[in-house]
Amino acid sequence: MPDRTYEFVQLDVFTQTALAGNPLAIFTDARGLNDAEMQALAREMNLSETTFILPRDPATEAREGKKVRIFTVEQELPFAGHPTLGTALHLYASDLASNSTKSDQITLDLKAGKIPVRFTANSENAGRERVDGQVFGEMRQHEPEFGTTFSREEVARVIGIAVDEISSEWPIQAV
């Protein structure tokens, strides 16, 4: 990445306290970065996730949402909740989202598909504990895909614990 500069911000998600919560790095304009460079930057950030916003023309963003890619230090993810909420909040609160000042919803266009995130202020959170100054984000995730189930014995053997340490109340299943 010779002679290129990319701005990023680091947010503390799920908290109002600095240096608490779950940290997230967000590259605010990742145009020009290839997959390997995004992966290298995520590895350099060394956080659980790093997101890369790829701005598009306003008409496409209004129709398709904000293009965002999510990386861990090891690989790209099609979806993860923490970076989706954190990136959507950053867009909601910044001038990068050209329509965010007119709408309470930001749609992210991720590898997994489009994920709408709706924001509400305290006065709109009926039935929830009010916390001054907070904004609440809700996202509609895709339906889960349920995969293979595993026996308690198999899981106990793999993780090195006794079978009776695993509850038999619920199935053990890949989701």
Q: Where are the regions that the model predicts?
A:
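Active-site proximal loop and beta-alpha junction motif in alpha/beta enzyme cores
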Residues: M1-F79, L85-V175
